[in-house]
C-alpha cells in the first residue's frame, strides 16, 4: 500500500498542520511515517544514525527536531481488518497522535458494507478505542452523515473524541444549493442558475 514519506514531508513543509495517512495496515508503514513526520528534515543515512543514537549524542539536533515537529499531527487512517488486527501495535509507536476511522471503507473491508450497527463493526470500533486509550492516543471518526446523528452519538459513547464532519466540498455544495433554492424561491422556479 502507498506510504510515501517524501509526500508527507512535502505537505508539512508547505504548511499543513499534520496528515491523515491513508489505509495504514503495517508497523513498517507507521515507522516510515513517524520518521518523516517526527524527524524532519533528516533522511537516509543521517536519519538512520540519528534514530539509533542515544539522547545525549546530539542534544542540539534532538532539541531542534523536537521543537520543529512537536505540533505536527499524525493520524493513521484505519480502514481494514488487518489494521484492526494490529491496532494495538500500530498506535503504540511513539509519534502517532491517533487514528481516524473511515467507516465506509472499514465496513466494506469487514464484508458488511454500510452496516454501521452490525456487531462486527461495533466490535472493531471497540478494539480501536481500547487501543487508543491504552496508549493515550486520539480516536477520531470520519463522519459523513452515515447513519445520522444518533449513530454519531453512539460512536461518541464508545469513546471517539474527535470528528471529521463532512468535507469542505460538501459544505460548499450545500451552501450553493441553499442559495440556488432561495434564489429560485424568490425569483420563481423558471430562473436559470449558472455555477
What are these regions (language model features)?
Residues 1-195:
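Expand to "…catalyze enediolate/carbanion chemistry for C-C bond making/breaking, isomerization
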